[in-house]
A protein has these predicted regions:
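Core domains of carbohydrate- and sulfate-ester-processing enzymes
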Residues: 128-189, 291-320, 385-413
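Aromatic- and acid-rich polysaccharide-binding/catalytic face
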Residues: 215, 220, 226, 260-262, ...
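Acidic/aromatic-lined carbohydrate-recognition and catalytic surfaces
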Residues: 1-3, 7-198, 202-205, 216, ...
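Alpha-helical scaffolding within the catalytic cores
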Residues: 12-16, 207-210, 267-268, 308-319
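Loop/helix patches that line or flank the sugar-binding groove of alpha-linked glycan CAZymes
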Residues: 24, 252, 257, 264, ...
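Active-site clefts of carbohydrate-active enzymes
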Residues: 192, 226-231, 323-346
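A short acidic-Thr-Gly-centered motif at the start of a beta-strand
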Residues: 101-104, 319-322, 357-361
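Acidic (Asp/Glu)-rich catalytic clusters
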Residues: 58, 215-216, 319-324
Length: 413
């Protein structure tokens, strides 16, 4: 795609003045930036493309946006962060982000950014510094004395405690990878994404400073990735981390909104509301196995409209038992799940009915980009993050993720 042949996304004129209630109950639109809208003809979505689509997003009635990770990363999905204080050059510049944030504020749109606290990239300076120290010999000074080698030392380097390192690979696990000749580090999601040690107060302080930075830049809050993996199998510790982070964010900006991803059962994910977090994604309603799709597909008394109404009441009662400020965050699908159109059999009536159920629920519903036009995508993750279709001319069209299989979009004109 050449820049000359790739025009800007269409300009949707939004002509209605809205009296937006300034609270944290919003209708959110999730944007996977890489695939959303290309503004410069390189085939990759970018922040300027998101800005060009604000009229379209607002015209649908959304007053909140969740951006997938936008920080520098070697991966297309950007969940392996190399620098928490910058914008990935594929997506533009910090000036582009500030412009997007300013446009959102002008329109009364709350802008959330994805914050990955569970792990970083192995190319992050913290990990690179720690790795270099672990490959070095001790400087010879005692731990309570100044380092004689500029903190490049296995005894004095503070960044070693930012991650999980061990001398012997734990038995019965495949989430540990070798570094050097005799050390191992933990990386649950992939070798390139080492786990951060959130039991270390210094790491928590780092993320408080990171939150401060982005709130100052114009973000209205955060979507927290992989919360249940902060301490896998230890929800109490996860909740404790969230509680500290929430107290900090609300002190800095009382209007800050935070939603967490806790991919668990209803009983388990609702417990996280005791942390003081604003919202936790409602997986009980999501995907093919969720209450919305089952109700629309209508099989059995347990999936009747009456049963759905009872489920909504149950959700609100459960949330209220943990927090009087809890806001439900229901959704049908996101970048990790099969597209809504597919789980509803590509039936236009069912797709619209499912959206109707979602948007009548209490709380802050989240809609994945492209679901409003019936985009398809299932199987491997890349397929679920396919290019947004703007028009028949290919305006703003991206290439989509590497290794994405061809998608048949049945509702595209």
């Amino acid at each position: 795609m050449s820049e000359s042949s790739q025009p800007q996304a269409p300009s949707y004129r939004y002509e209605h003045e809205l009296n937006v209630i300034d609270d944290n109950y919003r209708n959110y639109y999730q944007v996977f930036v890489y695939s959303f809208c290309d503004s410069n003809g390189d085939g990759i979505g970018d922040l300027a493309g998101v800005t060009s689509g604000l009229d379209y997003i607002q015209d649908m009635g959304f007053n909140g946006i969740w951006l997938s990770p936008i920080m520098p990363s070697d991966s297309y999905h950007k969940y392996s962060v190399k620098d928490y204080y910058a914008i990935d050059e594929q997506y533009g510049t910090m000036e582009d982000f500030e412009k997007l944030a300013a446009e959102c504020e002008k329109r009364g749109i709350k802008l959330l950014i994805d914050l990955v606290m569970n792990h970083s990239s192995n190319e992050h300076e913290w990990f690179k510094h720690a790795s270099k120290s672990l490959r070095s010999n001790p400087c010879g000074a005692a731990k309570d004395k100044p380092c004689l080698n500029d903190n490049i030392c296995p005894v004095h380097d503070k960044y070693i405690d930012y991650y999980y390192f061990t001398d012997e690979k734990p038995v019965g696990t495949n989430s540990w990878y070798r570094i050097g000749s005799n050390r191992w580090y933990q990386a649950v999601f992939s070798e390139q994404m080492p786990e951060l040690n959130l039991d270390n107060s210094a790491v928590r302080s780092e993320f408080e400073k990171i939150a401060d930075f982005w709130l100052e830049k114009g973000a209205g809050g955060f979507r927290l990735d992989a919360v249940k993996e902060y301490f896998s199998g230890n929800p109490e510790k996860n909740i404790e981390v969230l509680n500290q982070f929430m107290k900090h964010c609300k002190t800095v900006d009382p209007k800050c909104y935070v939603v967490g991803e806790v991919w668990e059962s209803f009983t388990n994910y609702t417990k996280y509301y005791s942390s003081g977090i604003d919202s936790v994604f409602g997986f009980t309603m999501a995907q093919e196995s969720g209450k919305i799709a089952k109700t629309i597909n209508g099989k059995g008394a347990d999936n009747s409209v009456k049963s759905f109404a009872q489920a909504m009441v149950t959700v609100e009662q459960k949330l209220a038992s943990y927090s009087d400020t809890a806001i439900d965050a229901p959704f049908i699908g996101n970048h990790d799940t099969n597209r809504g159109a597919g789980i509803l059999g590509y039936n236009e009536t069912k797709i619209k009915a499912a959206a109707g159920l979602l948007l009548t629920m209490s709380g802050s519903p989240f809609v994945y980009y492209g679901d409003e036009i019936g985009l398809s995508g299932s199987g491997r993750d890349e397929n679920k993050r396919a290019p947004m279709i703007w028009d028949s001319e290919g305006t703003g069209l991206t290439y989509g993720p590497p290794d994405m299989e061809r998608q048949e979009n049945r509702f595209a004109d």
